[in-house]
Amino acid sequence: MPYRMDRRAYAETYGPTVGDRIRLADTELFIEVEQDFTSYGDEVKFGGGKVIRDGMGQSPIANADGAVDLVITNALILDWWGIVKADIGIKDGKIFKIGKAGNPYIQDNVDIIIGPGTEALAGEGMILTAGGIDAHIHFICPQQIEVAIASGITTMIGGGTGPATGTNATTCTPGPWNIYRMLQAADAFPVNLGFLGKGNASKPQGLVEQVAAGAMGLKLHEDWGTTPAAIDTCLSVAATYDVQVAIHTDTLNEAGFVEDTIAAFKNRVIHTYHTEGAGGGHAPDIIKVCGQANVLPSSTNPTRPYTLNTLDEHLDMLMVCHHLDPAIAEDVAFAESRIRRETIAAEDILHDLGAFSMISSDSQAMGRVGEVIIRTWQTSHKMKVQRGILNPQGNEQKADNFRAKRYVAKYTINPAIAHGIAQYVGSVEEGKLADLCLWHPAFFGVKPEIVIKGGMIAWSQMGDANASIPTPQPVYMRPMFGSFAGARHATSLTFVSQAALENEIPSQLGLQKAAVAVSGTRQLSKRDMKLNDALPHIEVDPETYQVRADGELLICEPATVLPMAQRYFLF
């Protein structure tokens, strides 16, 4: 006789199933399970008296004959493509299969084989996401990487050489020698890393040598002079070598206005950093570019979301980051020109409309490296509270599935696509590197339970190492075995240009991590940004700074209280 479980008992045992809803942290966001790949009555679960035992849910099949290295059981996947309950099989550091795990000798519909060589990780009641991608990193100090991975970030893209004045302000690793040294330093860390060369030059040779040395892209920054000539040259070199260009435009409008910069793009694809403008860019109307089909717009997290504190903290941040002097009136005027409540408020709504495609940090250079994921979901929550259910399909779903998928894409798949690495990372899809985060729903977006890097646990919540069990206080994120020695080399990637691989730069430098080439960056458009491809016509009033999208005024109130904040942190 089959045994019938009530829905609550089932969820407590195997996790939620189709139709169940889950609250994300302490936000007003609720997601609903759309599909369940597991088979009722045939679920696998590890533990004493449970299913994954020899002759039951575990088969005698060797790994060489098809058993996986790691199975995550009964997890709820939240990704841009869906919200589904499934087992996840990981083999050779990659996602092998999303489906039903077990023993094919005694269970039906098994496509993930559990054998004696299979490790088990309980995903019951947990949310599984792709590791985050932060595509706006100032590599000012290596300690950023520890903070980032502890928050759920597994890929970091940007530039810098340490706390040099240039790096403090601009995301560039300038010149072959500096690029070589940073590529060598990348071997020390359990995350995927890629470096952007300096793109500011009106002649190509200085840019070509940086791409050939291993830069995975180029960065144009106003502090180095983002003139129309430099933009044109940089994009021309990028087109030749198939790398992405990121840009921080000319706040002071010295070399031209936003229209001149758009003209210099010549319809070529480009990633615009902090597209609202508080982080830098044509004042007051750089935000217009988010309506251009060739522009891939991102935000940095200090303006995410708009709160009653946002404006006040930005002025001090800006003075420090851009080497400005509060005693010089012109420097103060420069700073004040970038901070506008109207465009920051509009940025919230443009994210909710899918017109802004990505969110990143701007680490230690007007951004917090450990808060990309938190700020993304705080923005989503604020928009739910202020704008209601986001339901463009017009169906009757009461949950926030569409909004959740739109927002998770902003720090996972979309930056991966933008920088030519989506074939490797950026989503929970078969064949990709198993860079994954497991979250307790109550801590979703705030503190991951486990960060898996290339199929191995790299960071995890862990209690007192001298305790008799893993859970006694103090419990906090700590590096695990995947973060050490050769394991970090085997489970992480370094992203470089195809030209660098052809020049055998990785072997010349003795790199231990696998170096892989970015590709497909120059054929992109805004339409390639998953669930974030809207192209509204943006107008900015030059006197009031009011923003309109397709004629509609974009205005919202600042948040006075946010979830995912003091409830979770002592400091």
Swiss-Prot record:
<dbReference type="GO" id="GO:0043419">
    <property type="term" value="P:urea catabolic process"/>
</dbReference>
<dbReference type="InterPro" id="IPR032466">
    <property type="entry name" value="Metal_Hydrolase"/>
</dbReference>
<keyword id="KW-0963">Cytoplasm</keyword>
<dbReference type="Pfam" id="PF01979">
    <property type="entry name" value="Amidohydro_1"/>
</dbReference>
<feature type="binding site">
    <location>
        <position position="221"/>
    </location>
    <ligand>
        <name>substrate</name>
    </ligand>
</feature>
<dbReference type="Pfam" id="PF00449">
    <property type="entry name" value="Urease_alpha"/>
</dbReference>
<dbReference type="InterPro" id="IPR011612">
    <property type="entry name" value="Urease_alpha_N_dom"/>
</dbReference>
<keyword id="KW-0378">Hydrolase</keyword>
<feature type="active site" description="Proton donor">
    <location>
        <position position="322"/>
    </location>
</feature>
<comment type="similarity">
    <text>Belongs to the metallo-dependent hydrolases superfamily. Urease alpha subunit family.</text>
</comment>
<dbReference type="InterPro" id="IPR050112">
    <property type="entry name" value="Urease_alpha_subunit"/>
</dbReference>
<dbReference type="InterPro" id="IPR017951">
    <property type="entry name" value="Urease_asu_c"/>
</dbReference>
<comment type="pathway">
    <text>Nitrogen metabolism; urea degradation; CO(2) and NH(3) from urea (urease route): step 1/1.</text>
</comment>
<feature type="binding site">
    <location>
        <position position="138"/>
    </location>
    <ligand>
        <name>Ni(2+) 1</name>
    </ligand>
</feature>
<feature type="binding site" description="via carbamate group">
    <location>
        <position position="219"/>
    </location>
    <ligand>
        <name>Ni(2+) 1</name>
    </ligand>
</feature>
<dbReference type="InterPro" id="IPR029754">
    <property type="entry name" value="Urease_Ni-bd"/>
</dbReference>
<feature type="modified residue" description="N6-carboxylysine">
    <location>
        <position position="219"/>
    </location>
</feature>
<dbReference type="InterPro" id="IPR005848">
    <property type="entry name" value="Urease_asu"/>
</dbReference>
<comment type="subunit">
    <text>Heterotrimer of UreA (gamma), UreB (beta) and UreC (alpha) subunits. Three heterotrimers associate to form the active enzyme.</text>
</comment>
<dbReference type="GO" id="GO:0016151">
    <property type="term" value="F:nickel cation binding"/>
</dbReference>
<feature type="binding site">
    <location>
        <position position="136"/>
    </location>
    <ligand>
        <name>Ni(2+) 1</name>
    </ligand>
</feature>
<feature type="domain" description="Urease">
    <location>
        <begin position="131"/>
        <end position="571"/>
    </location>
</feature>
<dbReference type="InterPro" id="IPR011059">
    <property type="entry name" value="Metal-dep_hydrolase_composite"/>
</dbReference>
<feature type="binding site" description="via carbamate group">
    <location>
        <position position="219"/>
    </location>
    <ligand>
        <name>Ni(2+) 2</name>
    </ligand>
</feature>
<dbReference type="GO" id="GO:0009039">
    <property type="term" value="F:urease activity"/>
</dbReference>
<feature type="binding site">
    <location>
        <position position="248"/>
    </location>
    <ligand>
        <name>Ni(2+) 2</name>
    </ligand>
</feature>
<dbReference type="GO" id="GO:0005737">
    <property type="term" value="C:cytoplasm"/>
</dbReference>
<feature type="binding site">
    <location>
        <position position="362"/>
    </location>
    <ligand>
        <name>Ni(2+) 1</name>
    </ligand>
</feature>
<dbReference type="InterPro" id="IPR017950">
    <property type="entry name" value="Urease_AS"/>
</dbReference>
<keyword id="KW-0533">Nickel</keyword>
<protein>
    <recommendedName>
        <fullName>Urease subunit alpha</fullName>
        <ecNumber>3.5.1.5</ecNumber>
    </recommendedName>
</protein>
<feature type="binding site">
    <location>
        <position position="274"/>
    </location>
    <ligand>
        <name>Ni(2+) 2</name>
    </ligand>
</feature>
<keyword id="KW-0479">Metal-binding</keyword>
<dbReference type="InterPro" id="IPR006680">
    <property type="entry name" value="Amidohydro-rel"/>
</dbReference>
